[in-house]
């Protein structure tokens, strides 16, 4: 999602006549698009700020900012100004007296293309996170919510920048289409990340997303397809549809079918789905549509009914097994990857064994193991003390890793001599080729006369010739 958010910020700034650059050294302004899912992600921001020269202005946006703005009352116990309560605020400008700047609901409603608007400064008890960061790094100039990207031109005027912006200002993040801006980290990447929704209503006990991104909002089918067309016209080959619960969109099946029809598309993927919102028709498309990648990433989080219930996941372990059976019944082999939260509070040894059992049954190709991170304001933060000893945590992680290594090794053996397609995302100096296959496995093509003419971001057919744990080796079929 951060890739898609960053593309929208870059697009608005480009239309304000700002020029994107590749390195910090070239930049006048460095923008941090932050994540708040785990505390470690927020801690990384502090580490990265140390690397920015003081002559560079710094802006910070993303979930860390949205979460801290939205939940100031939860975290500090201080009364919020009315403007903050209703969400009618667009940024924190760091002047001598830090203040939130924004537009009232009525001003937003009456805003027209020709109206440059006037930002209203509102004094309030300043957020401790913003205060501490801005006191430590004097080059921080602006904090803003990613939802308010459409009002960046007005914020920049308030900061004294000369802004030329001839497009309609919008308070709807989803309507900003990043024309001519690739949504990947590399400007020449052939993958585009397209959000089809934002926010979440699930309120899992551990998850900060509903607090950081708000309640779920679904974007119109026409808008999503329009954005996909723009990316494909710019040379993109792979599209990834994004949503916190991506397949909960009421028109998700229609979106998938419409994008699959678009000229120039080679691969289509989506993340992250939820097991209880899968339709049999969607699964059937994985079997019949060659452009819909043979890979499903499904974040089960645990194999224990007791833990799933404490997490408020809304499904049982038995439903996980049933869903896996449906995937395995398809005639087209599908790679399955998952997320597992380790060390969730009060997870017993019996609970952990149930997760190992699910892993063995599903034969996951990859598990993204997330160490439980306590997030302020969540139900787990308020109700579930973390009482699992460190030694036990370490043992459980090692056990799950050992099991995953064995399963990955066995799964990858079955790939040998299979023919697949891959995307090239790195070419080494010795001309070894690195990339990933349509079923999301890392692959290496060793340097040979056949690889001499390959280019970065190419899609090409390959034959698997060798397996390793978590990696494959192959040769191009050209």
Where do the model's predicted regions map?
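Short acidic (Asp/Glu) and glycine-rich catalytic loops that position anionic groups and cofactors
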Residues: 266, 301, 336, 374-381, ...
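Short flexible coil/turn linkers enriched for glycine and charged/polar residues
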Residues: 187-189, 200-201, 292, 302, ...
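Proteins enriched for Cys/Gly/acidic motifs involved in redox and nucleic-acid/cofactor modification
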Residues: 1-242, 281, 292, 296, ...
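Conserved SAM/AdoMet-binding glycine-rich loop
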Residues: 59, 67-70, 232-352, 360-361
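Terminal RNA-binding accessory module
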Residues: 383-478
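Short acidic, glycine/proline-rich loop/turn micro-motifs
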Residues: 308-311, 379-383
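Structured core elements
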Residues: 193-195, 240, 269, 295-299, ...
